[in-house]
């Protein structure tokens, strides 16, 4: 039997074993756990919200795990308590790719001032993002004052992470020719700070050149009147150089948000967006598992595939089977 009060006290006391159990509870999709998880989160919510929430993404091969290990270790040496969470929609298929990352984060994984949590295997991006957001509440209530949320893998995970953090850090590499090559379309717009990693040895000069070129491109993209133009820095996670400057720029961004009132507004907007996102996910789940929908969906899908039925008509029939009348229809 789960004692929610005992869990809440253990989390607030910063007991690692209880924190891990609390996160397992909020990640659970079992109906009997969901009510208990919400009760626990309601108790912890007043004690959360004071941490710096930072999203970390990167181009393939950038050395994200090595960066987070070095960056997080630097932060704990400065007296911070660091939590690392991940949004990995593929984790249910791969068995949790950040499990491998955790072993690569050799220093943070054993640092008493850090907590590295594998990505929840919730299957869908919505499910993973929900579990990560709720894990963040637990981590903050437990006293972790820096939460690093890593994007792993595919699709819209960057956008999902940007919607739950204060600042978004994008890691990239020096490339010959086009410095924007390899950065997914749309991800650049999310970035608040960029860092060209692996600025060491023979690559150091290339990394500095790349940082200058990217900074110029961003100035053009954001315009002269932008309140914040994302700075572009060079760093080496392997040699732990330039990481302090990355932290300084992230702190400057947070200070700007805080001093203009945008931090509070941003977090409130994120909560409202999150509320409606959960409504959409829950409705979609109910619709897909509805007996009436399940009985008609295979035939309708086949008819759409065969070109016998338009997608719009198929959607209307699915909604009729769900028992949700169209707008304007009686009853």
Model-derived regions: residue spans:
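Short, charged early-sequence alpha-helical segments and their helix-coil boundaries
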Residues: 37-48, 54-60, 310-331
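Generic preference for hydrophobic
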Residues: 116, 187, 232-234
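Long, well-ordered amphipathic alpha-helical subdomains in the mid-to-C-terminal portions
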Residues: 19-21, 234, 245-323
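Nucleotide-state-sensitive switch-loop elements of NTP-binding domains
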Residues: 3-13, 17-51, 57-62, 68-157, ...
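Flexible active-site lid/hinge loop adjacent to a nucleotide/diphosphate
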Residues: 176-205
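Expand to "…catalyze enediolate/carbanion chemistry for C-C bond making/breaking, isomerization
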Residues: 2, 6-13, 42, 56, ...
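Canonical P-loop GTPase G-domain recognition
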Residues: 193, 199-257
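Alpha-helical scaffold elements adjacent to nucleotide-binding pockets in ATP/GTP-utilizing enzyme cores
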Residues: 98, 135, 160, 164, ...
């Amino acid at each position: 039997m789960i004692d929610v009060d005992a869990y809440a006290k253990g989390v607030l006391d910063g007991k690692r074993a209880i924190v891990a159990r609390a996160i397992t509870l909020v990640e659970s999709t079992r109906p009997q756990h969901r009510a208990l998880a919400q009760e626990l989160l309601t108790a912890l919510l007043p004690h959360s919200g004071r941490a710096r929430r930072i999203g970390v993404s990167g181009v393939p091969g950038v050395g994200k795990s090595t960066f987070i290990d070095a960056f997080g270790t630097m932060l704990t040496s400065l007296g911070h308590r660091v939590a690392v969470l991940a949004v990995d929609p593929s984790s249910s298929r791969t068995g949790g790719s950040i499990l491998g990352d955790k072993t690569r984060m050799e220093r943070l994984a054993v640092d008493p001032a850090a907590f590295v949590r594998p990505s929840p295997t919730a299957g869908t991006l919505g499910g993973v993002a929900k579990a990560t957001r709720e894990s963040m509440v637990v981590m903050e209530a437990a006293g972790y004052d820096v939460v690093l949320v890593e994007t792993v893998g595919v699709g819209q995970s960057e956008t999902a992470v940007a919607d739950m953090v204060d600042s978004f850090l994008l890691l990239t590499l020096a490339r010959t020719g086009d410095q924007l090559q390899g950065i997914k379309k749309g991800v650049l717009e999310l970035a608040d700070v960029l860092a060209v990693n692996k600025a060491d040895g023979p690559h150091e000069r290339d990394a500095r050149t790349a940082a200058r070129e990217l900074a110029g491109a961003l100035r053009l993209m954001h315009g002269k009147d932008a309140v914040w133009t994302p700075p572009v820095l060079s760093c080496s996670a392997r040699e732990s150089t330039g990481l302090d400057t990355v932290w300084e720029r992230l702190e400057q961004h947070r200070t700007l948000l805080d001093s203009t009132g945008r931090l509070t507004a941003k977090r409130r907007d994120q909560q409202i967006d999150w509320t409606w996102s959960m409504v959409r996910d829950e409705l979609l789940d109910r619709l897909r598992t509805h007996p009436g929908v399940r009985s008609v969906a295979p035939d309708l899908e086949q008819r759409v595939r065969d070109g016998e039925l338009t997608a719009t008509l198929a959607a209307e029939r699915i909604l009729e089977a769900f028992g949700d009348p169209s707008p304007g229809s009686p009853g």
